[in-house]
């Protein structure tokens, strides 16, 4: 590590709030699946900014759309119409089959917006008594870090000393349809769930789980809200992760890859029954739906489809999953994944996953640990077979080491 990097990290430590603990690398450039640090070292990005850079770093077509729009008009607020919002609505609706769109910025904003919307639907359409609406969520969830969201987290570090929290949430085990059935009451307005729990360690529910969930929600007039902010837009080898079981959510949340890493853009996708309950002045965002965001998102969606990134995620994800499972390492407890959303869970006695991520950095791989003993792997969807094979070589030599 050069003296300039040491000085840079010292400045961050001195002046920045310590709410993150990054790997000790300072990145300055990216292209496709690759990023470079300030010392000129190249790394294969196996995090993709938590799946926000699915289309690859600095995709030229998205960049061109952003630059062109930035020269024309960037922000109007929603006090006025802009010429990019309606085309954005048309294109995201056509891509996903949605009937109504609420544009926001961050993923957490989309989650908060969905919570407000389904509660309002519960009171005005379903007939739940005022202030009695209940939303069911899952243990080990991660939907964001705003106050409303961390209130129904089960992670002590995420929610500790941030209360008091808003009422109205019931927590059940993830992947347990029987628990959902038992938790539903006449006041239940929604079940908010991730198709795959990413932050928890890429936890995939049992086959058939979401088919049963869909049946239960339909039978009990409960809105199924799928948080596809990480899983959506091709990450799992399908446009939406819900498609693996052939179901359709009532409310779908998108973000991250919706703008290809260039801009914070998120969206709540639903129907008129839910989003039609919102009236002027009841919800909004100065930046949500701005012309720059819409132009960038339109380009990001186009390249995802036109360049076959979703199909590539399925193909390369299968190659990567098989290769990781073939690694014979006593340190590895389980390998799991769907598409290009994967995880290697280590035996506790193998040592902390962060140490393995630091070793991978030394071999030109950037990956992220989560929950102590799990390495998350989520490269951009543009990764090639040769790049997958090279990455597997680095994982093989690293995972066979003992950092206990």
From Swiss-Prot:
It comes from the Bacteria. Keywords: Amino-acid biosynthesis, Aminotransferase, Cytoplasm, Proline biosynthesis, Pyridoxal phosphate, Transferase. The keyword Amino-acid biosynthesis applies. GO terms for molecular function: identical protein binding; ornithine aminotransferase activity; pyridoxal phosphate binding. GO terms for biological process: L-proline biosynthetic process. CDD domains: OAT_like. Its main location: cytoplasm. InterPro entries: Aminotrans_3 (IPR005814), Aminotrans_3_PPA_site (IPR049704), Class-III_PLP-dep_AT (IPR050103), Orn_aminotrans (IPR010164), Ornith_aminotrans_bact (IPR034757), PyrdxlP-dep_Trfase (IPR015424), PyrdxlP-dep_Trfase_major (IPR015421), PyrdxlP-dep_Trfase_small (IPR015422). NCBIfam families: Orn_aminotrans. This is Ornithine aminotransferase. It comes from Bradyrhizobium diazoefficiens (strain JCM 10833 / BCRC 13528 / IAM 13628 / NBRC 14792 / USDA 110).
